[in-house]
Amino acid sequence: MASEARESPANNPGLSTNRDEATKGYIMQQTMFRIKDPKASLDFYSRVLGMSLLKRLDFSEMKFSLYFLGYEDTTTAPTDPTERTVWTFGQPATIELTHNWGTESDPEFKGYHNGNSEPRGFGHIGVTVDDVHKACERFEELGVEFAKKPNDGKMKNIAFIKDPDGYWIEIFDLKTIGTTTVNAA
């Protein structure tokens, strides 16, 4: 298969084929976004994207809060604060929203850089949905801002929406992502 050749070590200098046994059990656990207003961000990630709040940590001395969100079922999560923290940090693919207190009401605060304008850096996170077109119809009804709709551009059947701080979220489904990427490559 042609796709196997692209992933082979010969075509990817620097790729190690010997996974160190010490890394067994590692997971991609979180990515962090700095946010201006937790009320707006929590509404977006819970109501629009359907995530649950897994854990909130407040650091009074340093004047910031952390909100961990994901798609895990919280009904079986531990209620003990320490156990809940350990449980949260064991979940794969969570989002950590970091709020520095006061930014939500500071007229001088201009927001954070999302990485998609110069100087480019971090690009986006991705969320798999059942049907990208139906999901995007719902997002439009909810007034979500789009960076790209599913029928725009050369890569069809993927979309990019923006959260309240302007971070991009790629939206795709498993029914179309394979052909979408193969046709664009």
From Swiss-Prot:
Enzyme class: lyase
InterPro entries the record matches: Glyas_Bleomycin-R_OHBP_Dase (IPR029068), Glyas_Fos-R_dOase_dom (IPR004360), Glyoxalase_1 (IPR004361), Glyoxalase_1_CS (IPR018146), VOC (IPR037523)
UniProt superkingdom: Eukaryota
Pathway given in the UniProt record: Secondary metabolite metabolism; methylglyoxal degradation; (R)-lactate from methylglyoxal: step 1/2
GO terms, molecular function: lactoylglutathione lyase activity; metal ion binding; protein domain specific binding
Cross-referenced Pfam families: Glyoxalase
Catalytically driven reaction(s): (R)-S-lactoylglutathione = methylglyoxal + glutathione
CDD domains named in the record: GlxI_Zn
Cited SUPFAM superfamilies: Glyoxalase/Bleomycin resistance protein/Dihydroxybiphenyl dioxygenase (SSF54593)
Record's keyword terms, sorted: Lyase, Metal-binding, Zinc
Domain VOC: 27-174
Residues annotated for substrate binding in this entry: Q30, R34, N100, R120, H124, K154, M155
Cross-referenced PANTHER family: LACTOYLGLUTATHIONE LYASE, LACTOYLGLUTATHIONE LYASE GLYOXALASE I
Role this protein plays: Catalyzes the conversion of hemimercaptal, formed from methylglyoxal and glutathione, to S-lactoylglutathione.
Similarity comment: family membership: Belongs to the glyoxalase I family.
Name of the protein this chain belongs to: Lactoylglutathione lyase
Record organism: Arabidopsis thaliana (Mouse-ear cress)
